[in-house]
Amino acid sequence: FLKEDVADPCQPVRFREDNGWLVRFYYYRERISVEVFHALSDGGGAIVFFRTLLAEYLRQTGVDVPAGNGVLDLNEPPREEELEDAYARYAGSRTLRGKLEKTAFPNTSAPEPFYTLNVTLGLVPVDRLREVAKSYQATITEYLTAVLLQCLLENQAARRFRHPQPVALAIPINLRPWFPSETLRNFILTMR
């Protein structure tokens, strides 16, 4: 439940560990982080939970942090909108099946042990990043997606495949801007 930070984040959630909690908290020096099982919430809901938790921690140390701006009021019961299954409201029982897509380029490198993830940390001034993205008439997400796709194309070209394959990324899309919802539950769609 509360652990010292680990080298390999996003390990499988084992329901019998940590008394059934589907949330993990990590600390390292003055940094804390949280992992939330995807069935509980997406990044949008998880950040509200994390902000609220941090606000309560600060309150208990004597710092006044008001509710609002992504911090829930712990003296109020959860609102129905926060608990809503927005998928059920907007999609109902309908499912959409995409066309079968061609197999994408396998961007593989030296094998890692099972469930090993490598974390790369970079700091970029967001104003400068927004400016560069805007110069391509793109959002930051669109621009970074294009940069990643370009890297995949260059990686494939360097390997000199006889028959190049399409490159693909799985991008999580927050559905709240298109389907109004205040749910704190998972409400994303992964696009390829």
Regions found by a protein language model. Give the residues of each.
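Short amphipathic alpha-helices and their capping loops
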Residues: F1, G68-V124, I171
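Acyl-thioester-dependent acyl-group transfer interface
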Residues: F1-R24, L121, L153-R192
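Glycine-rich, often proline-containing surface loops adjacent to acidic residues and nearby aromatics
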Residues: Y28-S33, V126, L189-T190
